[in-house]
């Protein structure tokens, strides 16, 4: 069984027992339970596919926050030839790792 959920403006394929990385979830600590309510699609174990318009109302996905962290640094550089102009800037994006506990179809 798997589901397609929307979190942080992006879509993820999630399965029970798997961990996925999304944009930072503010207000929740590590070990706390979260509910993912923006479910776009679910495929059950017997092959039945449920598609929402845009979201499914009768599906509930429960997960646990594993960690909050920051991704690897992305280096951005500006350069102008022959003018001795070079600027380098780094960025590290915050993320939240969520482990999916169960997918319930009501």
Curated annotation (Swiss-Prot):
Statement: the UniProt record of this protein carries the keyword rRNA processing: no
InterPro entries the UniProt entry points to: bL21-like, bL21-like_sf, Ribosomal_bL21, Ribosomal_bL21_CS
Disulfides per UniProt: none
GO biological process: translation
Cellular component aspect of the GO annotation: cytoplasm; ribonucleoprotein complex; ribosome
GO molecular-function terms, A-Z: rRNA binding; structural constituent of ribosome
Quaternary structure and interacting proteins, as annotated: Part of the 50S ribosomal subunit. Contacts protein L20.
HAMAP family: Ribosomal_bL21
Family: Belongs to the bacterial ribosomal protein bL21 family.
Protein name, per record: Large ribosomal subunit protein bL21
Gene name tied to this protein: rplU
């Amino acid at each position: 069984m798997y589901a397609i959920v929307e979190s942080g403006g992006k879509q993820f394929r999630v399965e029970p027992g798997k961990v996925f990385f999304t944009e930072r979830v503010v207000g929740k600590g590590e070990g706390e339970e979260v509910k993912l309510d923006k479910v776009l699609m679910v495929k059950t174990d017997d092959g039945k596919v449920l598609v929402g318009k845009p979201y499914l109302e009768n599906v509930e996905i429960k997960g646990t926050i594993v960690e909050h962290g920051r991704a690897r640094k992305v280096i951005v550089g500006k350069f102008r030839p022959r003018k001795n102009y070079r600027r380098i800037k780094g960025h590290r994006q915050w993320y939240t790792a969520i482990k999916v506990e169960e997918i319930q179809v009501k």
